Amino acid sequence: MKLLHQVAAFNRAEDPVSGLLPDGATALFAGAAADPNCQSLSGLRRRLERKKEAGARFLQTQMVMKPDVLEHFCNEVANPLGLPVLAGVFLLKSARNASFINRVVPGACIPESLVVRLDEASDPMAEGISIAAEQVRSYLSLAQGVHLMAVKAEERIPEILNQAGISLVPV
């Protein structure tokens, strides 16, 4: 919350230490993290409402593995707050990777059907890329965007986007 207040102050050209920013106001676009798998969406909505009041202008979710969870989060939390959502898509590299995440990452909820799908795949990484691409396509109908988490496999992001039908624009 303090960081959101600080960004809002910078956007007003204010510096709590020295007064005014010497180069004028910034134009930072602050967001807030949200966990769509949270058990208490009403509590989450209250926390995110305070973050919005502090200056959050969008939400970026933790990894979400099921479209119905994202849809419920958007309908019950994000949409009533008027905050756009970037849905978190995580590249699962293998069944072992998915099981590990379920075991050690708080709030992670990778369905057993996806673990089995990865386990039965002849090429688990290719299957993980397909799963991520399916999620991107699905989530873009529910949220305003996605953010991809491809830990130690960032070079696979173009492949995910290509399979999802998203054209890359050269920079």
Residue locations for each model-derived region?
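Active-site glycine-rich loop that binds ribose-phosphate moieties when present
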Residues: 15-19, 39-54
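Structural motif
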Residues: 54, 80, 141-142
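Catalytic beta/alpha-barrel core
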Residues: 57-66, 147-150
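Substrate-binding cleft of secreted/luminal carbohydrate-active enzymes
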Residues: 133-140, 145-149, 154
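C-terminal/domain-terminus segments
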Residues: 148-171
